[in-house]
Amino acid sequence: MKKLLINGKKELSGKISISGSKNAALPILAATILSDKAKLTNIPLVKDIFTMVELLKFIGLKINILKKKHTIEIRNINKNIKTLAPYKLVKTMRAGVLVLGPLLAKHKKAKISLPGGCAIGTRPVNLHLFALKKLGAKIKIKNGYIVAEAKNGLKGANIDFPSISVGATENAVLAAFNANGKTILNNCATEPEVKDLIKFLNTLGGRIKIVGRKILIDGCKKIKKNIIHEVIFDRIELGTYMIAAALVGKKIIFNKIDSKLIQNEIDVLKKMGVKLKAQKSTIEIFKSNNIKKINLSTKPYPGFPTDLQAQIMVLMTRAQGISKIKESIFENRFMHVPELKRMGADIEIKNKTAIIKGPSKLTGAEVMAT
């Protein structure tokens, strides 16, 4: 898709079923390296998923995609597994580095290309490697690859992450899944996607518990076969649609969700004057004319997600008065601001904070997506 042509002033209404979460599906797909046979349902059929499937096929897994059912079937029966993730399959998908943990755990070695750059900021893998070294892996960086080895297997450890990282938490959990002994991970990411990965691993035979920001892992003794797992809904997709509904909706109903996983977003929209009704598995949003100003800061879950920062900023342009949003996760996530200003938004950036003066009447313009 090279361009989208959008004709404005269209009032939206209807029902939307939310897709499965890409950010949950990717680490779970990587986790199937630890399994014998698994079926994953509610899979979103997006580019990163297909890239991860190609990577797993390259490694040696047998995979069948049932597109109409949004289901992927995985068989891990190949004895000649490659413990390599080449650059061509990792450069466009940062989640490729998540095969590092399960390859080390099951096959005691891995050679993984360093991920490519990211437009929204630097996202180093140093915390991934920090955790794996604590578990006993020998790691070196050579010719653009992470070369890791654990000849005698990984051993449980007490790991204190210096900062919260979703990817590093996931890789550490995957690596420690069948490590010898107990592992304690402190200062972990506890996003719903991380919890969904742990739910899959526990179905597989894992013994993993979450207590606050601590994850306790007792090395798995026996893998269960023929497991089925339904991936959770995409809370970022839902949040995006909710904001769109607040902007141009008449009445929109969202299905296939768990409202308690997006309570922060619901609270923010209510504070901004958005009319909505949240139930356990559905949310209704009604036409909202009097949008109120608000000050926000992006934070790790359960705080306001950085992945909805750009979307909520559009809603802020409709608010009466000055709204502010601080980006505390990434250092380069205001690339959408010049494009919104082209459409008529009044936005100023000071350090890590965007100051939005509203209300602004946005008009159609040619803009660039990032």
Regions found by a protein language model. Name each.
Residues 1-370:
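Short, structured segments at the rim of ligand-binding sites
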